Amino acid sequence: ERAREMGYRESSCLRGGLADWLEAGYIAVDGTSCMTKSYAEYLEQEMKTPSLTPDEIRQRIAQGEKVALLDIRVPEEYASMAIPEGISAPGCESAYRFLDLVPSPDTLVITNCGSRTRGILCAQMLIDLGVPNPVASMRGGTLNWKLSGYDLEFNRTDRTAPPSFQALAFAREHANMLAQKHDISFVDAAELQAWQG
């Protein structure tokens, strides 16, 4: 009932709860960031989010293919260790910096994080936004890059410049199209404050 009050159109309750779920032989996931990790795995399977291994990415770069490696980790993680060709584009910032970071629609965009979760989420976000480029996540992220025998750079000091007006306009246009497609409405700051009491 509470979910419906919050505006959810469809909601249901699992009869018997978690105990019956486990008794039926299904698994429950717990641990650090388990909801996010589970959601990313589900999203990748349901949406068929493309992914490439470090070897496949390295091969494409060696063949001269245009590739943009968007490292979507927070700046501190990027600074500590990053793929040499990586570009810092933290999380959702990759959307509103996209046009500045990837000016050619022919460029293959690869999103990577430390392991894979945020890379999957960001790749699917860019796909859903309708960017003109092919997009994939890196399987296993930065750690898998290293385990595959490729170098990392440490103590990176490069920073991504603030987004241009054109990049922000591009992101806004694509976000509005996505919201319209899924019938998502917006609230302003005053309405949000009213909800918060």
Language model regions located:
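Cytosolic catalytic domains that perform sulfur/thiol-centered chemistry
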Residues: 1-197
